[in-house]
Curated annotation (Swiss-Prot):
Originating species: Mycobacterium tuberculosis (strain ATCC 25618 / H37Rv)
UniProt-annotated binding residues for heme: 346
SUPFAM superfamilies found in the cross-reference section: Cytochrome P450
Residue spans crossing the bilayer: 225-245, 294-314
UniProt entry keywords in alphabetical sequence: Cell membrane, Heme, Iron, Membrane, Metal-binding, Monooxygenase, Oxidoreductase, Transmembrane, Transmembrane helix
Leading EC class: oxidoreductase
Necessary cofactors: heme
Keyword Ribonucleoprotein recorded: no
Family: Belongs to the cytochrome P450 family.
Stated name of the protein: Putative cytochrome P450 141
Location (main, coarse): membrane
Amino acid sequence: MTSTSIPTFPFDRPVPTEPSPMLSELRNSCPVAPIELPSGHTAWLVTRFDDVKGVLSDKRFSCRAAAHPSSPPFVPFVQLCPSLLSIDGPQHTAARRLLAQGLNPGFIARMRPVVQQIVDNALDDLAAAEPPVDFQEIVSVPIGEQLMAKLLGVEPKTVHELAAHVDAAMSVCEIGDEEVSRRWSALCTMVIDILHRKLAEPGDDLLSTIAQANRQQSTMTDEQVVGMLLTVVIGGVDTPIAVITNGLASLLHHRDQYERLVEDPGRVARAVEEIVRFNPATEIEHLRVVTEDVVIAGTALSAGSPAFTSITSANRDSDQFLDPDEFDVERNPNEHIAFGYGPHACPASAYSRMCLTTFFTSLTQRFPQLQLARPFEDLERRGKGLHSVGIKELLVTWPT
């Protein structure tokens, strides 16, 4: 990057499962850099590990301010709803506390056999298929949608419809404002209807717990609860699909790493940490706005400036990780921030780790000879946007 050029986001990503080379370039030469958004606005991007952690824990970088109409319209969803992506302070604390009541250790323990059954069913479908097959279509997508369905206590077809609307509401540049508004209206109507049903007929699921707890405590409005639950859907459908698919692609590309897990299932938990470090779900995080003048890594950001962090880039920082571009399922230590950092860190990290460990343990034991059916170099990126790290398909094969 020259001293006068400003890179445009979304960045080119020649290898779909690898971060854009632009992130490495910025991290090494301009760790706090201006970037151009699809809207034409300019924002700051922070790319080094320590700086990213600093921003994520700094109250002067506000998610709430990013939801103001004067902020760049990066992701329409953020400005449409008071979600976990667009609130700070006591309001955010109340929302997290309510969500934590649903994602408590007891609930996660009760979900473990449910998750195992979902994984087993998906792998049964894989075993019944004639290779080569698209692993994403047969395994990753059904698992992602069924996990969310069980978590929320709804049917998989409902999750599929919710996810379709969320994709539009989270669009960076693919659709127009009118379509975003239409999808958003449908999305809110669906979630409010589900919440009312859960209040009338509660079950042992996240939605029921949240709906009942909020009725008793009255800490949030219906609109705020809807926003919080939509945040869960955003992170709970596309993210596991991308992490499972891209994680497997990395394992099969580095076949010796896959074989280590086949040989010793006890290595899977540590491997999951490397998979999420190496294969993050997003290239940059949601927008924040600086509320007062601040200096990051020698660069002055004035109050009102829009700013992003890149956990993807931070997790490849050579000042934090030895050989950060090497995929090593036994990496230790591995103090990544794949699940975020600070007040807005992922509230479902323990649940996500359990799901991923269950999945990769079962997969490597049932399909020890799984292989890529197409060269790794031929993988294609699914599309551009904030959630742009997915691949179109992952063809796999195995001896029959």
